[in-house]
Amino acid sequence: MQLNSTEISDLIKQRIEQFEVVSESRNEGTIVAVSDGIIRIHGLADVMQGEMIELPGSRFAIALNLERDSVGAVVMGPYADLAEGVKVKTTGRILEVPVGRGLLGRVVNTLGEPIDGKGAIDNDGFSPVEVIAPGVIERKSVDQPVQTGYKAVDAMIPIGRGQRELIIGDRQTGKTAMAIDAIINQRDSGIKCVYVAVGQKASTIANVVRKLEEHGALANTIVVVATASEAAALQYLAPYSGCAMGEYFRDRGEDALIVYDDLSKQAVAYRQISLLLKRPPGREAYPGDVFYLHSRLLERASRVNEEYVEKFTKGAVTGQTGSLTALPIIETQAGDVSAFVPTNVISITDGQIFLETDLFNSGLRPAVNPGISVSRVGGAAQTKIIKKLSGGIRTALAQYRELAAFSQFASDLDDATRAQLEHGVRVTELMKQKQYAPMSVAAQAVSIFAAEKGYLKGVELKKVGDFEAALLSYMNSEHAALIKLINETGDYNADIEAELKAGLDKFVATQTW
């Protein structure tokens, strides 16, 4: 078969027209060293700090050290098969995670991939894990409460929406239990929750997820997991991933609560990465920027104003503020709050709840030490009735501690001192609360009212718990309208006080506890 010149020319023209030019500018480099999850790459001339680097097998590394002739990157995942000479590429992207309502009720890893076996996630888009926190002008003061359901916390150390309240204490003092109860208490409050588990056992996390499901709180909670067996890079990044997921709700005029459990393990993971990258160690072998590690994370928890939300949503949401409340957890060693990471996080947050081993072992749970626990901004957000009634609780407990120590050496005590001791020991007993049993505002108000107005005076110490349970049951059945009113409004006036007093007088007369 012979083709003439015209046919050949037409065929070439046709081929040229059909040819599609696909150009992709990708910077390529070569791995020159692999050790302990850290790779050194030569040849990446154009790479950003924190950029994702594509590795073979759908894996990524994050560029952390940008040096003159090489790049130090940390691998997110297994690295045993990586070897010298393997080609890698830049992506031009910072790490992003999926965000949206589709994540609620799901358990995901640091990268936002589902690990609960419930199928793919229907996300609303992606968000970078590292975001600059809202500025001063974009924020609004904290004046709405987050009810934890704990009398000891809501009365003495109140937390507001947009606040950062540290939960600090030794191991096995009830830190996680307090945070999980706070999440369970948001079941009907409309606050979306994010629980970030860093460096924990998989069995512990499975137990937490099961408890959240049992109490109906998993449906409005996202669980982000980086277990102890996962790469240090994933443990270091997990809190930032969870924060990005929580910010999705804040920026759309909603309220969210995030628990970081715990930031001590995140700091250890970051220390490991920094030392392997040959960064100079500082105090306790942590790198120099460990303060910035936590400050840039916790500053993202905030209450943003109406203008910020309106601008972010392009006018879709107007007249609403958004908030992200953070409950970071720090584990201390032998109660040493003056160590490097605890002092850093105490100085960043808006207050701390200090849980003590001695109190926990003595049966006082939650083991809150009211002497050194404080909330710096929550007072403005406290529910009116709790604020009015709880003023004397902290004073009573502080005086009781002081007098109890003094009374060990004094043989005879005057009546006033003995009365203070009696009152203090009963208030301490009243502050005890079982796990997974958060209390409503009205229930807390009734209990505190009973303590403040002297109704516990004639109650045996070991019967205080029974007295409270019977009292709450009585008030719920006989004064249901009052309980409903307090729960809905949180108000306190002469009428409410009179009805509470009348209810308690009747109950005490029955002696049914």
From Swiss-Prot:
Short name of any one Pfam family annotated for the protein: ATP-synt_ab_C
GO cellular component, one term: plasma membrane
UniProt EC number: 7.1.2.2
Compartments (UniProt record): Cell inner membrane
Swiss-Prot/TrEMBL site (Required for activity) positions: S373
Keyword Translocase: yes
Residues reported to bind ATP: G169, D170, R171, Q172, T173, G174, K175, T176
Membrane-related topology note: Peripheral membrane protein
Signal sequence extent: none
UniProt keyword terms in alphabetical order: ATP synthesis, ATP-binding, Cell inner membrane, Cell membrane, CF(1), Hydrogen ion transport, Ion transport, Membrane, Nucleotide-binding, Translocase, Transport
SUPFAM superfamilies: C-terminal domain of alpha and beta subunits of F1 ATP synthase, N-terminal domain of alpha and beta subunits of F1 ATP synthase, P-loop containing nucleoside triphosphate hydrolases
A molecular function GO annotation: proton-transporting ATP synthase activity, rotational mechanism
Family: Belongs to the ATPase alpha/beta chains family.
Function of the molecule: Produces ATP from ADP in the presence of a proton gradient across the membrane. The alpha chain is a regulatory subunit.
Name of the protein in question: ATP synthase subunit alpha
Gene designation: atpA
